[in-house]
Amino acid sequence: MKSRTLWIAVFVGIIALGLGAAVVAAFVTDNGERSVSGTSTGSSSVADTFALPLGLESDTLALAKHRRDLLVGLAARPGGPVEVATVRGDTPLSGDAVRVAVDGRVVPAEPCGVGCSRVQAPVLQGRPSRLTVRAGSMPVSFRLPATLPASGGSELDRARRTMGALRSYRFTERLTSGGPVVFTRLNVQAPDRLSLRTNSGFRSVIIGHKRWDYQDGRWQGGPFPGLAVREVLMWYAARNPRILRRLPNGDVELAAYGLKPVPAWFRLTVKPSGRVVEAQMTAPAHFMLHRYGSFDRAPAIEPPQ
């Protein structure tokens, strides 16, 4: 597997996907070695992988799924159109490689940019619809609700305020590009401390403008651009959230789309308190699941000895 597919946990949210004007991209190779390269905000190749003109429109629903390394994401407007982005790994698929069906009927598609196909279909207009996208032998289906779900703007705003105000928390990350999986455990402490450890044994500690990585049997320190812990929350800049459902315990499930840290679809489960307990990010070759806990109870993060 290419080393770039093993983006380490926090470096997805803070380093590899951009922090400030100058950041560091950290990758892990198959044999556990680490390479570092400089980048700048918004320079990730993911940003140029696909187009989705409807993605940021306020009257749309954005959903995404993946099967192995195939990503299929959409943005649907009541009454149509529906735009579908299809990317295999980092490669956008042309329109002639994609077939779209609504309620079992193949509908004609027109291009709407790189890797993007637009279809006219009377979705979100009073009855549920099933949209199926087929790229080769891989069908990916979505059940669209009868109407456009209610805005989840207030719920997402509450989640931003609540999670951004925490003194500390823990989360786990499951990251894959469609093949092998990297698991990472992270501790976060406001305002600027973070520690992580992957299932391969890689460890790192960040405190302010200092960073330590465990390499060759010892801790090695170096400078770091600095971080604000809210930027660890990869969903923080998501846009146009929609309420997919309200659970009996009061939790709310949201779907959203955004351009930061890269163009991606997001799914969040938000407690009535505003605490996020689970979040997914679906972007080309980067399929992540975060689970949060130990709110204001995570251990203090200190420089490694």
Regions found by a protein language model. Name each.
Residues 234-245:
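A short, amphipathic edge element
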Residues 3-158:
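Intrinsically disordered, low-complexity terminal tails/loops enriched in metal-binding residues
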Residues 126-128, 163-168, 185-197, 204-211, ...:
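Short, solvent-exposed coil/turn segments at beta-strand boundaries
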